[in-house]
């Protein structure tokens, strides 16, 4: 399965939402599983993520909606806390085949 899973709390804990594919905005979606943050808007509320894909894929999280602004890349298969500047400031995301990523989070 190719998913980007965002979590309300750090260390991939609390309520979660899983996205298959790109999300132009996180502001129309809600954390759905039981736990801290359930039914809260995903936009500007995620603290961590699981890039639930193979190692040749990348999950990219953006500060702004529409895949714009500063971004953070995470290599497939990794569970990470969002960096301080992006924690609770997430607005959109995309995932793609990258052959592996380079930069922070990889």
Description of each model-found segment:
Residues 1-106:
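Compact beta-sheet-dominated domain cores in extracellular/mature segments
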